[in-house]
Regions:
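Non-ligating segments of multi-cofactor redox enzymes
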Residues: 1-100
Length: 101
């Protein structure tokens, strides 16, 4: 399920340069979930993007996983390293992660 695209199209936020959905009130620190229904619900307009020239997420990514706007190298992403990687975290990335586990 393309959760971010569905959430964007539903007006819940916009896709930031870090490739996560950003909600104007909640930021990007939340989980997405879906309920599929055939109920006739009102449709919200998609949210417009507000990143503009901001590159803060790229600048502060501790492991340099955001290699370009809208492009993430998952092999450097802390979420991948701590949840999905089935081997030891590469030694070069450990100091960059700090206590973010």
């Amino acid at each position: 399920v393309l959760e971010r695209a569905l959430a964007r199209d539903a007006g819940l936020g916009w896709i930031g340069k870090h490739s996560c959905l950003i909600n104007k009130d909640a930021g990007s620190w939340f989980f997405l979930g879906e309920i599929y229904t055939d109920l006739p619900l009102p449709v919200d307009a998609p949210a417009s993007a507000h990143c503009g020239t901001c590159t803060r997420c790229i600048e502060v990514c501790p492991t340099g996983a955001i290699v370009a706007p809208y492009r993430v190298d998952a092999r450097r992403c802390i979420s991948y390293l701590t949840i999905e990687l089935r081997e030891s975290i590469p030694e070069a990335l450990r100091p960059l992660m700090g206590n973010r586990i």
